[in-house]
């Protein structure tokens, strides 16, 4: 009984959680199968819809298109945000960069026209709309990380003979790299939530978001669930991949994280 009690006590050390996770997954699947809500398709119906989408609707091709779009937007948003974050450490740039974080309140419907004029085709339009949305949120959190740098850290860098942009590189870029990777990983998930909206606006370019909008238009619930679960699985794999990259570049994270 004592060992079971430890599983519901916060921060209590326990053994492996793999068996517990498998058990919970099995329970959820059973509840899903016996659910009385007929509006929610069961797993077998979703599997049949997934096969139909993959063989007749080109879902895997559309997923690849969306993956390229997301990857491009993540790269551009991360590069822009990191560049602005470095500039933010200089007082002259702080007001304008702080103001840029307010752009996260703008909706895509009101700015699509301008991005249409600035881009050459639908693929570029999707990438830059996503980049805009992701950058606004990523920048807000990145500035919070930079503001968390203490005066003691800055003074310590100065005692080592570092000043100006070199101090910024050591204290902010290298010193907060693991936190920046976590932000990018979280922002990548935000990108998938924005994707359907963007691909719905630029539907002629395709993508899994456009396919989802088409299925939603016809209230094809089996297909909707199949697409959503496909995005969910892909997003989880993407999250693990980004976390793995972070652990490779910042191996000290594993030593400082609570298990």
What is each of the regions a protein language model found here?
Residues 128, 132, 165-198, 230-233, ...:
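Transmembrane alpha-helices
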Residues 141-180:
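Short cytoplasmic-facing helical segments at TM-TM junctions of multi-pass membrane proteins
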Residues 7-10, 33-75:
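Periplasmic/extracellular loop-to-transmembrane helix junction in inner-membrane transport proteins
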Residues 78-83, 125-154, 185-194, 241-242:
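Membrane-embedded alpha-helices of multi-pass transport/permease systems
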């Amino acid at each position: 009984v004592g060992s079971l009690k430890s599983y519901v006590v916060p921060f209590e050390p326990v053994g492996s959680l793999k068996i517990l996770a498998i058990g919970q997954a099995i329970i959820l699947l059973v509840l899903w199968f016996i659910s009385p809500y007929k509006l929610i398709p069961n797993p077998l119906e979703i599997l049949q819809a997934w096969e139909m989408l993959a063989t007749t609707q080109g879902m895997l091709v559309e997923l690849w298109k969306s993956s390229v779009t997301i990857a491009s937007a993540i790269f551009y948003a991360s590069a822009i945000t990191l560049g602005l974050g470095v500039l933010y450490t200089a007082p002259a740039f702080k007001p304008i960069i702080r103001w840029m974080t307010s752009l996260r309140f703008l909706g895509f419907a009101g700015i699509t026209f301008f991005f249409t004029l600035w881009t050459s085709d639908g693929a570029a339009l999707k990438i830059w709309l996503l980049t805009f949305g992701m950058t606004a949120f990523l920048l807000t959190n990145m500035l919070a990380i930079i503001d968390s740098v203490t005066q003691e850290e800055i003074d310590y860098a100065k005692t080592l003979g570092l000043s100006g942009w070199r101090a910024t590189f050591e204290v902010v870029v290298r010193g907060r790299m693991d936190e920046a990777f976590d932000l990018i990983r979280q922002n990548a998930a935000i990108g998938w939530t924005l994707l359907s909206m963007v691909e719905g606006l630029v539907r002629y370019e395709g993508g899994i978001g456009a396919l989802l909008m088409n299925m939603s238009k016809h209230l094809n619930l089996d297909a909707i669930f199949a697409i959503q679960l496909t995005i969910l699985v892909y997003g989880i794999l993407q999250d693990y991949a980004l976390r793995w990259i972070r652990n490779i570049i910042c191996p000290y994270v594993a030593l400082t994280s609570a298990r």
